[in-house]
Amino acid sequence: MSEFWLCFNCCIAEQPQPKRRRRIDRSMIGEPTNFVHTAHVGSGDLFSGMNSVSSIQNQMQSKGGYGGNMSANVQMQLVDTKAG
C-alpha cells in the first residue's frame, strides 16, 4: 500500500518571526541633559521616620529646581522580618 500525503495550507498558519531586540552599546547612549545632583537617599533614611523624610525634602528644595509647592500624603508600614 502506498502513502498518500495531503497538505491543507488553509489550516496551517505561518508562525510570525520573533522580533529581535536591537542591541545597544555605549556609543548609542548620550550624556545626561539637565541633570542636577541634589541628595543621597538610602533605604535606611526612609525607615528612620517622618522627620528624616521632611529633612530630605527640605535639603532637596534648598538645592533649587523645586519651585512648585507640592504636598503628598506618605504612609509607611514597617514589617519586622526577623525570626523569633
UniProtKB/Swiss-Prot annotation:
CRIB domain residues: 29-42
Compartments where found: Cytoplasm, Cytoskeleton; Cell membrane
Gene Ontology CC annotation, any one: cytoskeleton
Statement: the UniProt record of this protein carries the keyword Cell membrane: yes
InterPro entries per UniProt: CRIB_dom, CRIB_dom_sf, SPEC
Pfam name, any one: PBD
This protein's record includes keyword Membrane: yes
One MF annotation (Gene Ontology) recorded for this entry: small GTPase binding
Topology of the protein relative to the lipid bilayer: Lipid-anchor
UniProt GO BP: regulation of cell shape; regulation of Rho protein signal transduction; regulation of signal transduction
PANTHER family, per the entry: CDC42 SMALL EFFECTOR PROTEIN 2 (PTHR13502:SF4), CDC42 SMALL EFFECTOR PROTEIN HOMOLOG (PTHR13502)
Similarity-based family: Belongs to the CDC42SE/SPEC family.
Function: Probably involved in the organization of the actin cytoskeleton by acting downstream of CDC42, inducing actin filament assembly.
Protein name (record): CDC42 small effector protein 2-A
Lineage of producing organism: Eukaryota, Metazoa, Chordata, Craniata, Vertebrata
Encoding gene per record: cdc42se2-A
